[in-house]
Amino acid sequence: MAKLGVNIDHIANVRQARQTVEPDPVQFAFLAELGGADSITIHLREDRRHIQDRDIYLLKDTIKTKLNLEMAATEEMLRISKKLLPDYVTLVPEKRKEITTEGGLDVKNNEKYLKNYVNSLKSSNIEVSAFIDPANDQINSSGEIGFDFIELHTGKYAGLKGQDQYVELQKIIESSYYAVDIGLIVNAGHGLNYQNVKKIASINNMNELNIGHSIVSRALAVGLERAVREMKTLISIN
C-alpha cells in the first residue's frame, strides 16, 4: 500500500493572507499525523509566500513521522536544508509568478549542476528526490545523478478526463516500472484528490503519494484529522 505524505502549505497560505500567527501549520501537522499521515511535506519557497523559516525548524523538532522539504535547487536552500537536516528533500522547479508548481524539474538538461547539488545533500545524510514529469529521459538522468527517489508529476493526469486521462495514467505506470528497474524509489503527486487518487495508489510499485490541496479543502468541512483518514482509506482500497 502506498504511504501518504500530507502537504500543509495551504494551512500556511491562510495564515499569510493576514500576515498573522494563525492557523499554525505546526499544529495542523500534528492533526495530520493523528489522521494517519506517514510524512509531512512542506515547500519553502524563495519568496516565502506560505511556509516560513520558523515553521520548518519547529516541524523538524515536533513531528513524529518524516519531514519532506520541497525546495528549489538554490544555494540558499542548500544551506538551509543542510542546517535543518530533514528526512528527505524533494527538488522542484520554481517560478515567482506561478500559483503552484507548473511542471517537473528538467533534470536532463541540468545534470552537472544537479549532480553536485545532490552529492552535497547526500553528504549530510539527506535522501533526495526529484519532482519530474513521467518521461524516461528524465528518469534516466535522475538515476545517473544519484537521486534516491523520483516524484512523478501527476498534474496532467489530474486535469484530464476519459480516454485522455487513461493514456496519461498508462504513461505514469510505465514510468514507475522503468524507474524501479533502474533502482529508483517512486513517489507521485500534484493534483491528486478523493476522486482520482485510487488509480495512482493502485500502481504496484508506488511508494508514497504527496497530497495537499484536496485534503485541506476537505478539512474545511470535516476537520484535518478526518480528511487525512479518509484519504488513507481510499489509498488502501485497491
Curated annotation (Swiss-Prot):
Residues in the active site?
43 (proton acceptor), 70 (proton acceptor), 190 (proton donor)
What are the binding positions for 3-amino-2-oxopropyl phosphate in this chain? 7, 18, 191, 212-213
Instruction: Report the EC number(s), separated by commas if there are several.
Output: 2.6.99.2
Instruction: List site positions: Transition state stabilizer.
Output: 151
Its Gene Ontology molecular function terms? pyridoxine 5'-phosphate synthase activity
Write the record's keywords in alphabetical order, separated by commas. Cytoplasm, Pyridoxine biosynthesis, Transferase
Pfam families documented for this protein: PdxJ
Biological process according to GO: pyridoxine biosynthetic process
Catalysed reaction(s)? 3-amino-2-oxopropyl phosphate + 1-deoxy-D-xylulose 5-phosphate = pyridoxine 5'-phosphate + phosphate + 2 H2O + H(+)
Q: Does the keyword Transferase apply?
A: yes
Q: Which HAMAP family match?
A: PdxJ
Q: What's the subunit arrangement here?
A: Homooctamer; tetramer of dimers.
Protein name listed in UniProt: Pyridoxine 5'-phosphate synthase
Q: Which organism is it from?
A: Prochlorococcus marinus subsp. pastoris (strain CCMP1986 / NIES-2087 / MED4)
